[in-house]
């Protein structure tokens, strides 16, 4: 049973002895320490000193008595803690200065060796924190010895690894051979380093988790503390409020007590005065009894007279009060009747006004309904008219579109017929040309010369007339290939660029030639030649005014159509003139190209044999799609040349030198012509580009003009809509003003001719009724009030007699009650006086007793103070006797510290602690301990 309190006391002693650790140790987060880190060595020194001190105190704790150490732990002051902190800070600064100087010297000398020793330093980092795991001093010493051995072994291994065993020359020879099949050996330190890294990461993760948990706990604790503070503040506030209320209640009670005391004092004074008066009356009563008999009769007479006088005064007063009461009653009755009549008049006028208001509202609703019917009828008529016009416009638009489509369809049919006819003529011409070429290739040209000549003439007759008249019927497209008549003669399509330009320009030419049936048939084509885009454009342009015409008159619409058609005719005339110019340019270009082609064929025919010339001439003849009048002579010349060559093949085989010179001159002339043709061609191309640019500008201008017209139309439409809206607003405003004027007119009529005379009549009737009512009231008063007055006088006399009798009875009762009250009050005063006297007596005895007790307690306190001083002296002497043992323990501690310093010096050879600082630290510790023991 006695062991538990002893264990508890020992644990308290230990906590008290180790309290200085909590004050001196500064919390800091654990970092990964390196072997060259200053903080690492400082921590190790601190840990060693802590272990030494704790071990020393724990071993000697059982020998020391309980009470002095309890006093030491309990009486520790803030001054001792501050002294210890200052000493500790000075020691730490000394260690930091020494380590900084040492590290600077080592870093200046060993900059190159740092890169080599990174692996070994990394492996030592996780081991730096291992000393924190040990809780006992012996385990820590063992750990330090093992660490020292491991560092020496590691240094020896590094020395052996970096030692040069072989000369440099031998290493060079060996290196040449070993470089071929050299393999890197695995270093076990890398695996160890990885393991250390993993351990370090795990430790950091655990530290982070612990830090997070600690933060959460602190947050919870802070929240709990805040809640507690709020609760305490609320409790304090409530306590203060309750205290204030109690104080106010106390003040009120004090006030009430003072008031009660003052009242009692006044009552007492009154009683005293009454007693004095009664005593005086009792003294004078004996004298009055003698004269009482003489004055009784006189007093009775006086009393009788006084009573009569009082009765008269009472009667007069009662009469006055009755008169006033009657006046009040009659005035209230008259006022009530007047109010009732006024209410009836108001109700009548209100009912009449409501009837008139109903009539006016009904009349207004009727007029509004009539007006709405008229407006709806007009609106329906407008809508019918607008729908009729819209239907007519839509029908007219549909007919116009159908007519336009029908005319377009007719144009398209005519164009298709012309295309078919042209295709048939082309087929016939091709067949004839094929027959001619076959005959020429088979040598039957002489037999069928006349037919061969007639065939080209027919072809030229078919194709030529439109060209002579300055117009072109149609040109075959580029993808049409002529049929192959034979394998010797290949018919190629016309040239891509020139024929394409020519075809494009010729297709845009309007065909109009009076006098020829063919041209009459071709005259149907012009609307279709500009392309489907123009037709679509015209249809869309026609459709726009038709859509707009729904909102305008037909006459204006027709005028606009006529103006637009005139503009379109002018534009078409301009396009026709431009197309004619383009056609002339194309014809000139084609003629130049054809001439250059003929000269090329002639030069080739002169330079090459007959077998190669014939197909090319055939090909050139076929490739010329449209024959101009200037090229007929060249064709006849080419035919004559062909026939002459067939007749005289021997001469061609052996040409004369003159002929050669002529051929050369012809070639030169052809070259010059070709150069001129190219120049002309370039000029024509430039002109064509200019014309195209002008055409594009013209189209842009037309598009801009069209956009401007559309914008103008939109603006006109918008203005018309604005005007219509303004007109509608004006109409609505006029309607509103008319309605307001009508209402004002009706109100004026009602006020001037209806309400005001009716009000005058009502006022006159009210005045007459009031006069009649007043006259009738006066008559009733005269008739009934006299009888009522007599009855009231009789009842009043009877009541006065009863009242006098009742008054005398009440007076008797009051006198008796007051005498009884007076007796009870006297008894109460006597009782209170007795109680007060007893209280004074008791309080006086209690005061004497308290004074005696105070004197006794003061003497006892002085005795206790002397006893406590004696006990303190005894305790101090006893602790002084134990001081010898304490000094022995301090010496043992100092020896332990010396051992630790030696170990630190072994770890750090250059470390030296100044003796003065160490002695000062020791003296401060001993001084603080002795001071606490003395206290």
UniProtKB/Swiss-Prot annotation:
It comes from the Eukaryota. Residues 189-324, 366-438, 554-589, 660-740 form a coiled coil. Residues 596-661, 678-715 are annotated as: Disordered. Keywords: Coiled coil. InterPro entries: CACF_protein. This is Coiled-coil domain-containing protein 191. The lineage of its organism: Eukaryota, Metazoa, Chordata, Craniata, Vertebrata.
């Amino acid at each position: 049973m006695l062991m538990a309190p002893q264990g508890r006391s020992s644990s308290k002693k230990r906590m008290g002895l180790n309290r200085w650790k909590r004050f001196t140790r500064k919390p800091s987060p654990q970092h990964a320490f390196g072997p060259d880190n200053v903080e690492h060595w400082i921590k190790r020194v601190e840990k060693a000193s802590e272990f030494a001190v704790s071990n020393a105190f724990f071993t000697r704790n059982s020998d020391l008595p309980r009470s002095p150490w309890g006093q030491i732990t309990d009486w520790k002051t803030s001054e001792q803690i501050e002294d210890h902190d200052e000493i500790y800070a000075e020691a730490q600064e000394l260690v930091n200065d020494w380590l900084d100087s040492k590290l600077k010297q080592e870093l200046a000398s060993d900059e190159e060796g740092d890169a080599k020793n990174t692996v070994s330093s990394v492996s030592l980092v996780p081991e730096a924190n291992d000393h924190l795991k040990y809780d006992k001093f012996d385990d820590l010493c063992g750990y330090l010895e093992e660490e020292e051995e491991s560092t020496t072994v590691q240094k020896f291994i590094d020395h052996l690894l970096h030692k040069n065993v072989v000369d440099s020359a031998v290493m060079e020879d060996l290196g040449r051979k070993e470089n071929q099949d050299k393999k890197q050996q695995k270093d076990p330190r890398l695996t160890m380093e990885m393991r250390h890294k993993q351990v370090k990461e795990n430790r950091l993760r655990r530290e982070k988790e612990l830090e997070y948990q600690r933060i959460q706990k602190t947050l919870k604790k802070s929240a709990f503390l805040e809640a507690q503070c709020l609760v305490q503040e609320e409790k304090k506030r409530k306590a203060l409020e309750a205290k204030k209320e109690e104080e106010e209640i106390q003040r009120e009670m004090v006030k009430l007590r003072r008031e009660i005391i003052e009242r009692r004092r006044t009552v007492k004074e009154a009683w005293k005065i009454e007693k004095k008066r009664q005593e005086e009356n009792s003294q004078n009563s004996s004298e009055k009894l003698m004269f009482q008999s003489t004055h009784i009769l006189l007093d009775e007479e006086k009393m009788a007279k006084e009573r009569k006088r009082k009765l008269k005064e009472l009667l007069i007063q009662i009469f006055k009060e009755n008169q006033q009461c009657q006046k009040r009653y009659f005035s209230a009755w008259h006022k009530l009747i007047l109010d009732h009549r006024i209410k009836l008049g108001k109700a009548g006028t209100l009912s009449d006004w409501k009837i008139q208001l109903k009539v006016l509202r009904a009349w207004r609703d009727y007029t509004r309904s009539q007006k709405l019917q008229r407006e709806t009828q007009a609106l329906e008529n407008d809508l019918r008219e607008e729908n009729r016009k819209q239907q007519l416009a839509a029908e007219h638009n549909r007919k116009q579109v159908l007519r336009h489509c029908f005319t377009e369809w007719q144009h398209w049919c005519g164009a298709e017929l012309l295309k078919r006819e042209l295709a048939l003529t082309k087929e016939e011409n091709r067949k004839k040309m094929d027959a001619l070429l076959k005959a020429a290739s088979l040598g039957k040209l002489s037999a069928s010369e006349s037919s061969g000549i007639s065939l080209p003439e027919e072809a030229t007759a078919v194709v030529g007339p439109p060209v002579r008249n300055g117009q072109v019927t149609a040109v075959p497209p580029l993808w049409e290939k002529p049929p192959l008549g034979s394998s010797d003669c290949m018919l190629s399509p016309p040239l891509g660029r020139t024929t394409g330009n020519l075809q494009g320009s010729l297709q845009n030419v309007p065909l109009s030639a009076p006098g020829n049936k063919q041209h009459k048939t071709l005259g149907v084509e012009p609307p279709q030649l500009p392309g489907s885009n123009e037709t679509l454009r015209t249809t869309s342009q026609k459709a726009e005014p038709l859509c707009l015409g729904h909102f305008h008159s037909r006459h204006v619409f027709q005028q606009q159509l006529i103006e637009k058609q005139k503009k379109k005719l002018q534009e078409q005339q301009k396009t026709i003139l431009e197309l004619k110019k383009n056609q002339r340019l194309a014809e000139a270009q084609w003629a130049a190209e054809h001439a250059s082609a003929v000269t090329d064929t002639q030069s080739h025919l002169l330079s090459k044999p007959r077998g190669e010339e014939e197909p090319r001439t055939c090909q050139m003849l076929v490739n010329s799609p449209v024959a101009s009048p200037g090229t007929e002579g060249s064709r006849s010349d080419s035919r004559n040349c062909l026939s002459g060559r067939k007749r005289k093949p021997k001469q061609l085989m052996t040409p004369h030198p003159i002929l050669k010179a002529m051929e050369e001159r012809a070639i030169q002339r052809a070259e010059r012509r070709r150069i001129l043709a190219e120049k002309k061609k370039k000029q024509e191309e430039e002109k064509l580009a200019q014309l195209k640019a002008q055409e594009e500008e013209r189209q842009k201008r037309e598009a801009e003009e069209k956009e401007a017209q559309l914008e103008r139309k939109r603006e006109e439409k918008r203005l018309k809509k604005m005007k219509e809206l303004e007109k509608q607003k004006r109409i609505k405003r006029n309607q509103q003003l008319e309605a307001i004027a009508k209402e004002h007119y009706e109100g004026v009529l009602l006020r001037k001719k209806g309400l005001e005379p009716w009000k005058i009549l009502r006022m006159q009737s009210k005045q007459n009724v009031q006069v009649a009512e007043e006259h009738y009231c006066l008559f009733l008063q005269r008739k009934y009030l006299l009888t009522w007055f007599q009855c009231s006088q009789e009842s009043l006399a009877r009541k006065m007699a009863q009242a006098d009798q009742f008054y005398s009875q009440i007076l008797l009762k009051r006198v008796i009650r007051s005498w009884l009250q007076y007796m009870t009050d006297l008894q109460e005063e006597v009782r209170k006086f007795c109680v007060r006297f007893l209280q004074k007596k008791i309080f006086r005895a209690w005061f004497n007793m308290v004074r005696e007790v105070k004197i006794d307690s003061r003497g006892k306190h002085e005795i206790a103070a002397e006893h406590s001083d004696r006990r303190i002296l005894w305790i101090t002497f006893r602790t002084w006797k134990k001081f010898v043992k304490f000094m022995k323990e301090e010496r043992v501690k100092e020896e332990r510290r010396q051992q630790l310093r030696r170990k630190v010096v072994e770890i750090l050879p250059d470390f030296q602690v100044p003796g003065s600082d160490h002695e000062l630290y020791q003296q401060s510790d001993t001084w603080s301990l002795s001071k606490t023991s003395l206290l």
